[in-house]
Amino acid sequence: MDKGRAAKVCHHADCQQLHHRGPLNLCEICDSKFHNTTHYDGHVRFDLPPQGSVLARNVSTRSCPPRTSPAGDLEEEDEGYTNGKGDRKSAGLKISKKKARRRHTDDPSKECFTLKFDLNVDIETEIVPAMKKKSLGEVLLPVFERKGIALGKVDIYLDQSNTPLSLTFEAYRFGGHYLRVKAKPGDEGKVEQGVKDSKSLSLPALRPSGAGTPVLERVDPQSRRESSLDILAPGRRRKNMSEFLGDTSIPGQESPAPSSCSLPVGSSVGSSGSSESWKNRAASRFSGFFSSSPSTGAFGREVDKMEQLESKLHAYSLFGLPRMPRRLRFDHDSWEEEEDDEEEEDNSGLRLEDSWRELIDGHEKLTRRQCHQQEAVWELLHTEVSYIRKLRVITNLFLCCLLNLQESGLLCEVEAERLFSNIPELARLHRGLWSSVMVPVLEKARRTRALLQPSDFLKGFKMFGSLFKPYIRYCMEEEGCMEYMRSLLRDNDLFRAYVTWAEKHQQCQRLKLSDMLAKPHQRLTKYPLLLKSVLRKTDEPRAKEAIITMISSVERFIHHVNTCMRQRQERQRLAGVVSRIDAYEVVEGSNDEVDKFLKEFLHLDLTAPMPGTSPEETRQLLLEGSLRMKEGKDSKMDVYCFLFTDLLLVTKAVKKAERTKVIRPPLLVDKIVCRELRDPGSFLLIHLNEFHSAVGAYTFQASSQALCRSWVDTLYNAQNQLQQLRAQLLCAQEHPGTQHLQSLEEEEDEQEEEGEESGTSAASSPTILRKSSNSLDSEHCASDGSTETLAMVVVEPGETLSSPEFDRGPFSSQSDEASLSNTTSSITPTSELLPLGPVDGRSCSMDSAYGTLSPTSLQDFAAPHPVVEPVPVPQTLSPQPSPRLRRRTPVQLLPRLPHLLKSKSEASLLQLLSGTTTSVSPPAPSRSLSELCLITMAPGVRTQSSLQEGGPGWNCPGACGPCQGPPLSESENRPSHKAGGPADSARRKCREMPCGTVPRVQPEPSPGISAQHRKLTLAQLYRIRTTLLLNSTLTASEV
């Protein structure tokens, strides 16, 4: 090969490898022979100018011949001369003064256009010269022939246009633009097949280098740096681009080789590393030509990023998934050496037999129930292995590839932690659980060839709460991760291409990324189901106790996670409401000075904790809507109200009704008395202060009666819910050991004995009390015969209602206290009933129905009765457990009497129940109910000692008739309850709780028939009396 007659030069990596890592210079004959072979036909070559040429140096030549004469169309003189062999000589140079001349004003970025192939096959982007005096078809024909595309089967589109271009247009007009190539309708298959056939004929064999290492990666850095400098150095000088790219006026360029008409961005031969290296060098070479157009440069960079991403992903498919980037392996000193060992250890540790029968000898002799138990245990193990492998797919495929792409400058805008949360931490968690808990169970079975014991899992599942704490964060961020992923798939083309490639990987098993991100939540909720399946098929008591303990631990943690998620959602909803409230304009100042001091306090923080409740509880928005409000005698105004758990906000819309401002002070729910009005759809709210005095009255008008009913009911529910939250906080402060959620560390202490673990699941949360619709007004309380389900407090034997005192309820006015007994349970035994007056214990409707309402009774209904102040309970008393709230119906069957009572009169019944037939004078046939109550409880005036012996009972001062003697004075009543501390506590709570929200006291009845006789309730007496009256009436009618 004679370099003196060289006419072509090739800078391709393969050609440089043949020429000692330097450009390959060839004559025309050698070039045609060499580059027509299969492996080298796609190389880009450039023409070498002959000696003494007036042309500028070629972009890829290492030297330039000396100038023979000054050229007028060039901008600057050359700085040296070369000999015929291309060697530079720097001796004897003269520095001549440059002659001023007109600068070149052509835009280099307009002399090429980018050709993008919008086909279903991967074809590299081409940069094609926009030649003058040549049509678009003539310029594109060599490119399409090399790609195997028929020019007549495709359409060319300009940028984002949908109108095909004519191939007769002049190519020069499209310089600096972006052209898209799409197959014509009906010819897609033929075009794709032609491209594939062309690729199969021109694809070279991969070099047998170690592990597919690219050719250029083995070149020493110094040589690569010199080669890149050789390419870039000529490009820094301005040249006549039209002559350089092949204008017809240039001699020797009339019949250029077809491959010299286009400049491919990347080579299609060689390995992926060689392709990427050539692509980067080509992009660097042409960056100087297109730098003057910012928009074109940005678009070119976007296209280049997509090509880089496709090249990277293709390399991952060919040579395997990459490792985690080094900067993230801060926990290892020599991560490169340890990673392979760690991966092999994980693979060996996850080894599992095909069936549990391979572990056990003599499985044919097992009973059917034992086989079912082993299958349930095996399902727990097998699903754990499958889940760990799913997590590894997320970390090794999705996350690791994303981080490596970001190391290469791709997808840097994607936040990996926001997309995957703490999934790597979950993967480490489950690998630890598998190796420390489940592998020992398998190894024991493999060693002993015995059955898999479910109790062996207790060590790990007893610590479930502390071990699985990372799940709290993931479950709370899962929804955000899903939303972030959907937004990226919608807006980011590079991310969409990356996810599509990853989802098609064989490790994904046709699962989507969204399905993979939902696996942790699904696995957490599946543990109780798997353990319960094992429990149902286990007969050994000790094993069942251990499994119940594990189920309890898992369910407590899941309940805790649900609570955290619910509170987070409530906080987000509350933040949305706060953003809609614009200002707090409740008080107006009289002058500027007052406004200055007032401004500091004109704010309302709805995100602050609710007073009197646990800080963990979040204020909830229960109801919102538009109402018409009237305050005093003012005219009605349109308002927008927000009802929260503890307060009611009255606001008014501003401007476009998108935001509101607070116009009235917040109304505390526990200081509100609600009453419905006669006007349909209207209700009244009376705001009380700390002294239980009215400070404001607001009338609200809803658009319909149903909406008014909804506001009233929701307000009652808010009051009940708030009171319950405060009761829970006070009970938690006095009895912290009885809370539903105790500290996970205390419950899951490794040193605690298995026998001390509770075998039951966590108690369900108490039902929220709801005020009955029949108790909206104190004058219209529910009768004893109501069959609706009511919430009540059940007190175990020996327990008392010693929970902290409640504040006086919003509905507890003096008129409401008179009807307090009507809301108590009708099945409460007499010995534990709260103290009520005779009028309170009487049904007005019942007395009037049978004509037994005496004038004295009417006076009793109208006259208020003094309330006996209870004696404070001594502080030395031991704290009592908090009551449990249950739902029970207020209907109970009557206790069986020892002897059948047939046609007994009311007087005989009273004598039988009291047991004093001789000491009491025969009563009148139509005795009032209050007298019946007193005769049943005591035949005469009760002394202090009798009250102490009888324990807590009914206290009926002022209701005795003339024949029973004078009523007990207040001084006589007080000593009688000194020993009855629990009863006093219950009475105090009854008076302090609002009407309709008082829990029902339901102690366990004492055994024995005599106890049943002594503890007949007043409601039972009502029913007995009613039955006897009906029997007597029917008997009289028959006679």
From Swiss-Prot:
Tissue: Selectively expressed in cortical and hippocampal neurons with prominent expression in the cell bodies and dendrites. Weakly expressed in rat fad pad ECs (RFPECs).
Residue spans of biased composition, Low complexity class: 259-277
SUPFAM superfamilies: DBL homology domain (DH-domain) (SSF48065), PH domain-like (SSF50729), Ubiquitin-like (SSF54236)
Phosphoserine carried by residues: S765, S878, S903, S908
Annotated positions of the Phosphothreonine modification: T760, T876
Keywords from the named record: Cell junction, Cell membrane, Cell projection, Cytoplasm, Membrane, Phosphoprotein
Gene Ontology biological-process entries: endothelial cell chemotaxis; endothelial cell migration; regulation protein catabolic process at presynapse; Rho protein signal transduction
Gene name as annotated: Plekhg5
Record localization: Cytoplasm; Cytoplasm, Perinuclear region; Cell membrane; Cell junction
Signal sequence coordinates: none
Protein name: Pleckstrin homology domain-containing family G member 5
A cellular component annotation (GO) from this entry: presynapse
Biased composition (Acidic residues): 744-757
Residue ranges constituting the DH domain according to the UniProt record: 372-564
Function, in words: Functions as a guanine exchange factor (GEF) for RAB26 and thus regulates autophagy of synaptic vesicles in axon terminal of motoneurons. Involved in the control of neuronal cell differentiation. Plays a role in angiogenesis through regulation of endothelial cells chemotaxis. Also affects the migration, adhesion, and matrix/bone degradation in macrophages and osteoclasts.
Sequence ranges of Polar residues compositional bias: 758-776, 811-831
The protein's assembly and partners: Interacts with GIPC1/synectin and RHOA.
GO molecular function terms noted in the UniProt entry: guanyl-nucleotide exchange factor activity
Compositional bias ranges of the Basic and acidic residues kind: 185-199, 217-228
Boundaries of every PH domain copy: 620-720
Annotated segments matching region Disordered: 58-105, 185-277, 739-785, 800-836, 967-989
PANTHER family: PLECKSTRIN HOMOLOGY DOMAIN-CONTAINING FAMILY G MEMBER 5, PLECKSTRIN HOMOLOGY DOMAIN-CONTAINING FAMILY G MEMBER 7
